[in-house]
A protein has these predicted regions:
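Juxtamembrane/disordered regions of integral membrane proteins
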Residues: 1-118, 129, 133-165
Length: 165
């Protein structure tokens, strides 16, 4: 799987999530509530987008490093495994470890964790699964140049949707 494919997929998955939380008035029952997510994007803008996209990108990349022969469903399972470990470790060490007021981004994560609970794990698993599937599909269907164009278009689109009410 090409790095540009993973990046493009992560950008478009984050775009889809942002479109969902900005357009759908009430959350889907198995996904976390959107109050803290809306605050996350409103307060931190493109830094929030960058953190989300990099988390997805690095999660898939780390899964491919840890499980070098994994492809298809195996890579999806590896990526979900890495994402779950990340989420749990991040919650226990960073979110619970830092006192309120020390880091404004982590303060929003504290609210998000309280608001979303286990549903965050489901949402993150769906997101990372979507990144793996979309990246693989892009590798099969498109040239490197086309995927690079898609990635740039994804970045461009994220800039605008980030500041959409």
């Amino acid at each position: 799987m090409r790095l540009i494919s993973i990046l493009s997929a992560a950008l478009w998955v984050d775009f889809a999530v942002m479109a969902l939380i900005k357009v759908v008035p009430s959350p889907i029952w198995f996904l976390p509530p959107t109050g803290a997510l809306t605050l996350w994007y409103d307060k931190f803008g493109l830094a929030a987008v960058a953190a989300d996209v990099l988390s997805l990108f690095l999660g898939v990349l780390l899964a491919s490093f840890l499980f070098p022969g994994a492809m298809g469903l195996q890579l999806v399972m590896a990526a979900v495994f890495v994402q779950m470990l990340h989420d749990i470790f991040f919650y226990l060490v960073v979110i619970q470890g830092l006192p309120q007021g020390q880091n404004s981004m982590i303060d929003v994560f504290k609210s998000y964790a309280n608001e979303g609970s286990w549903k965050i794990l489901v949402a993150d698993a769906l997101m990372i699964t979507s990144v793996v599937a979309l990246a693989r599909l892009s590798d099969l269907l498109f040239s490197y140049r086309m995927i690079a164009f898609q990635a740039l278009l994804g970045m461009y689109s994220l800039i605008y949707i980030t500041y959409t009410k």
